[in-house]
Structure formats: structure tokens, C-alpha cells
Swiss-Prot record:
A lipid is attached at C19 (N-palmitoyl cysteine). It is found in: Cell membrane. One of its GO terms (cellular component) is plasma membrane. A lipid is attached at C19 (S-diacylglycerol cysteine). This is Uncharacterized lipoprotein GfcD. The lineage of its organism: Bacteria, Pseudomonadati, Pseudomonadota, Gammaproteobacteria, Enterobacterales. Residues 1-18 form the signal peptide. It comes from Escherichia coli (strain K12). It comes from the Bacteria. It is a lipid-anchor.
Amino acid sequence: MKKNSYLLSCLAIAVSSACHAEVLTYPDPLGSSQSDFGGTGLLQMPNARIAPEGEFSVNYRDNDQYRFYSTSVALFPWLEGTIRYTDVRTRKYSQWEDFSGDQSYKDKSFDFKLRLWEEGYWLPQVAFGKRDIAGTGLFDGEYLVASKQAGPFDFTLGMAWGYAGNAGNITNPFCRVSDKYCHRAESHDAGDISFSDIFRGPASIFGGIEYQTPWNPLRLKLEYDGNNYQNDFAGKLPQASHFNVGAVYRAASWADLNLSYERGNTLMFGFTLRTNFNDLRPALRDTPKPAYQPAPESEGLQYTTVANQLTALKYNAGFDAPEIQLRDKTLYMSGQQYKYRDSREAVDRANRILVNNLPQGVEKISVTQKREHMAMVTTETDVASLRKQLAGTAPGQSEPLQQQRVEAEDLSAFGRGYRIREDRFSYSFNPTLSQSLGGPEDFYMFQLGLMSSARYWFTDHLLLDGGIFTNIYNNYDKFKSSLLPADSTLPRVRTHIRDYVRNDVYLNNLQANYFADLGNGFYGQVYGGYLETMYAGVGSELLYRPLDACWALGVDVNYVKQRDWDNMMRFTDYSTPTGFVTAYWNPPTLNGVLMKLSVGQYLAKDKGATIDVAKRFDSGVAVGVWAAISNVSKDDYGEGGFSKGFYISIPFDLMTIGPNRNRAVVSWTPLTRDGGQMLSRKYQLYPMTAEREVPVGQ
């Protein structure tokens, strides 16, 4: 213990003296790097650093006992989240070879780190973190840690409980408060989120130093490990030293190579791939905006001029089925935006097209954006102000554009104007990739398929929509069973998923939807048919979303029957009502955050609430987590305790060369069970009314 006390004293002196050091000739540090477990840190131990907001990392680390696969994202400057799969190479997935073959054990877990204090001139940065939440608890633990930079050095000192503190090199200070803090449970219910063991059990001091070498790509690490590895799931691991050393080589701005020597006897290597969701920008090859070239004003709308404007509105400004009308001193334009995610870009292009050829006496341009024939918002622009903006003004004489967003104009009373008719029938063919991680038969299961979809508008409100899925290739032949859980008493509302996806061709959905703009911020829809892969039925939804408000409120009510996986045009005997009241909130103090709370009845007839929190970054990429808590007991629910998941929503135009409003969603659900499961509705009013949200930057 004297040796440990001497070491801790040296670390404390180093941190204290570092506070007075100055940056002289050393290059700027490359910034934080990922630890072995994922998330910013040293090697096995964490530090108090958090990557720049929006940074997303994919990590791999490998040694004799473990492989760590992780992703980490800095959601805010003060919050970081990590998802990890751990391959325990010395243990089998299960003792039944017929069930899981010779696959090694896979453990899944979630970590977070919260900054408590930002680094200043004198004081270090301080953070609290928790490892292995909602997992099996193999690496469960928490820590308090401080980091201070001084020149090319970054010093870290902290205290850990649980796995990272198993060495017990210091008495747990909370034991002085109560004896209950002296002991920690040795097992956990898999999938539970519990803080009942926080700051309990053995505790250890850990620390380390990172050194930014004069050669910019290279960063060195030295840490004192708070773990003794005597109770690892992989077995008792020999530890010749508590000191671990490592190096990080930044091969590119988006890639790190890692090499370390740990426990005095083990080599660890790996890599990190990174990007920043705030910095991503589409490499678009788009048509330029129309130049400001005003033509002489005409008397009324001229057919040839309007025809050219309608063509430009469709192909340059991205408005499908554009329509132009002139009433009094206002020129009205409406259409369905299919091209630009940013509504301001669409309105700007439309204004440029219209202002170049205005009839006499027009003082205002009114642009109404629609979705599925429902009017979303009208942007009114003063013509004189617009002309000044486009013509340019002398330095110091510029004026703000006189423009406002108002409730959508109802032009139906005016009759039809000049327009390009909508193609009522449309179809598409889209490749799909379904993925599953951590299954018993294989760590990675996938299915590549083709979704053939078609839509037909009978009227401006009534839509018929259908899709057929065709399998191209999968490795589902490795399935050894349907994996129906034996530890749950709930109706099998989702756990028959393997039986459904074994079909090579099936009708994914075939439904009729009636959409209605009810006015004053109210929108509604009624629908019926084969609504998703596993359910058919009828339902309706009503949404109230005030214009430019940070909140909305919706309700959906459905009655569904389960489709038969052996013949997906037929049904099983199971049916149920399901529906939710959902509140949506964009907190003004948390830029880009959307919170959703849905309360109601799930498919298994359990009742409860689902909370979904998503962070949208500057690029449009959104990262979200969700959890569903219902009135089902843990015993009835089975492994996992409750449903939860993680997703990333990526705008297509970040991956294409042209503007695009579509998105790709990558989702991860650690374990699919039957509790807390919602109907997967293809059309949902809140995302359909996105134009009613205040544009980013306004």
C-alpha cells in the first residue's frame, strides 16, 4: 500500500505543478482519443475529456481475451454516449452447441460520461461516468475523474468503483457514510438500467499522463490501472504490472491506429474511425440559383411566361405540381417540395424565379409549401425588399429582407390557377439492408433485399400505397430456431420476426390513407390495410402543431390483427387495439434536441410510456435513443427488463451528388422482446409536417 501511496502522491504533485506550465514550442495537441472500451479516455481507464460536439467514432480493440467493438458519439460538449459489444474469446455463447455452435460469448452494454466542470486556467475538467448500463454488468462501474492540460501533457486522476476499481487500492470513502456502500452485487439482471449499486463495493484510484510528441501524428499514454482482473468473466487474468503504456498514431484526420502493452504481459491493438456530424456537408452538383434579371412588368399573367416559371419552379426550386395565381397585389405560388431539406433554399429559389417576371402592381409574393397535398406553411415576401436584396446595396445601407412565415393560405376559394399537373401514379425500387448483431448463431446476421413500391392518388386526399419485398441474399440459413423466449408470458407480438423474414417474397404493406389539413395547425389521417410486415388493420391520427412552436401534440388509435407468417395474406387469431397520445418538444435551451413522450397501449396489450430523445446536428444527421416502460413485470417481460434502442438518421444528400429529402435510418435494438412494442406506421404526421418547425438558424 505504501508503494501505491507513493505513486498517488507523485501523480498529485504532477497535476498540481502542471497547472502552472505554459505552452511554448510544442505543437497543439491532437485532442482526445478513444479508450479500449470506447469513449474518450486513456487505455483501460477513462479521463475527463469529451470529444468535440458531434464527433462520431467507430472503434475496435483486440487482445488475447477480448475484442471490443464500440461506437461513441459526443452528443453535446458535456455529454458522451458509447455502445459496445465485447467478444469474450475464452467463453462460449452457450453450453448448447445445437443452439449457438462454437460462437464465443458476446456481451453488449452502454456507457455515458457527463462533464461536471469545464477546465479553466487553474482548475481541471471534472467528469462523472457510468459503464455497462442496460447490459449484463460484466464491466459495470462508475467513476469520478479530473483531467488538466499543461503544455504537451494531459494529466488525469480519478476514482473508480466496480470493474475499473476491482483492485481496491483505497478504502471506499462512502463506507464511512454507511456499511451498505462497502459491498456491491456480483450479478445483475441483463438489460436493466439500475443505479442501486452506484459508489458501492471496492474502489481504486487511477491516473495517467498523455504526452503529445513534437511529431504531430503521435500521442503517447501512460496509465495506472485501477483493476486487478481477478474476477473477469474471461477468467482470472494474470497482471504483472498496474502500469499500462500505449501510443496513438493519427494516420489521417479520420483514422487512429492504437497499440498498447497492458498488465505487464498483454499486447492490445486496434483502430478508430471518426467523423463529425456537425461538419459533414453534401458534395452537391446542383443547378445554380436563378440570376436576378427582372423583365419589364406585364399586364396580368402571361401564358408563356408562367409556363417557363412553372418549369423552373419544378426543376430548379424543387416544387412538384407547382401552381401560380394572381389575386389583387399578391402573386401566389404553391407546390410540394421534393428536393431541398432546407425550406429556406426552396423559398429563395421560388422568389427569384417569380420576381424576374412579375405582373404590374404585385407587392407581395406568397409561397405555400405542401406535403402529401396538405398545406404546411406560407412564406410572404415583400417585393420591394426582395428586389433591393437581389440587386445589392452599397456598403452600410443593407436592410433586412421583409419576409414572414404565416399559416398556410387556402387558395381553394380562388379556383385553379396555372399549374403543372401532378403524376398521380409513381413507383420506385429501393435496395434494403436489414442487420442484426449479437445473435446466437452468428454475431452478424443480414438480409439484402429489394423493396418495390407504388403509389396512386385517387384524389388530392386519398392515397393507395403498397410495397413488395424481394430477398436478394441473406445468411438466415444459419437460423437454428425461431428463438421464441421461454422466460416471457406476453403474447408473441414481435418475437416471431424470424418466421416472417424467412419468406423470400412478401407483401410488406398495402394500405389506403386519407390525409386532411384541418386548419389552424390541425392535421389528420385515416388509414387501413396491411400496415406493416407483421400487422394489418385500421387506424387514425390527429396532430396539433402550431406554426413555429417548439411543441406539438398528437394522438393515434388503431385496431390491428397479426399477419400469418406462413401465409402473409392471412391472419393469426391475435388482434388488439393499440394507440398513443404523444407529446413532442424541442427545448429552446437544447439546440437540435427533440423529445417525444408517448403514453398508451402497446401491441401486447401492456400499457405504458415510450420516451424518445434525439439530437440533430448541423449536417442534418440525428442520433436518438428510446426506451419503453410498461406495466409488465420483469418476470413476465423476460430478459432485458424493458424495450430500448438506438438509431442514427442520415440525410441521403450527404451520400449523393444531388439534393434529396429522403433519409436512411440505422437502428440498433439490443434485444427484441414482446413488451413495449408499437405499431410501425409508414405515415406519421409529425415528420410529415416538418416544414412547420422554425428553420434552423432563424
